[in-house]
Amino acid sequence: LITGLDTLGYYTSLPADTLAKITNFRSSNIYAEGLAYALNSYEQRKTGQPTVMRSYWREHLGLTPTEFYPMDGSGLSPEGRLSSGALSLILSELWRDQSLHKPFLASLPEAGVEGTVRSLSIPSEVTAYLKSGSMRGVRGYAGYLLHKDKWYSIVYIANGAINSAEARATFTRLLTGLFTQQPLPPLPAPAKKVAAKGKKHSEHSKGSKKASHKASSKSSRKGKKR
């Protein structure tokens, strides 16, 4: 007979720094959720929210609910709140903590080389270690950047980003403008407008092909350091 006090077995996970590296290199939402909820007590886990993580940073840095109020560990909840300023403060605090500085930096993939940022184009004068993040209409990068033997924390969030390629290119232009004397690289062409389906589409197709060819959608963005 098995009772609630019987131990059936033990499982030892990988070290926390290894789990963090897997999370950041693969951009694993499942790992991010697990790490956030692992900090909660048994009772707190019933809420389904990252209670301890949220309380710690809000109290430690004096962040308001509009600046920092995550509703999950992965950041996918549309009800969560995270400002670029709050994330910048957190990155700076982690950098100053000698016990967390090296393992956290090691958990971030190098831009243009590895992880989810291996295809990200950055200026050759810069070495960047970044975590990428995206959901519909939003793309961001956050981490640390080395330029001329000086380290910087950087956060970039593009809200209302219809075109992901444009959001990435804008981030590249930002780094180019801040840290080099090179001319800014061009932005990709705007995404073409998709014609509506049905009767309206049939009527439109009878019109001038030249006018249709010139039509393009307007993409908007709001960038800031993430």
Label the model's feature ranges.
Residues 1-98, 102-103:
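A small/polar active-site loop signature that marks catalytic segments
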Residues 56, 66-209, 213, 218-226:
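C-terminal soluble interaction/assembly domains
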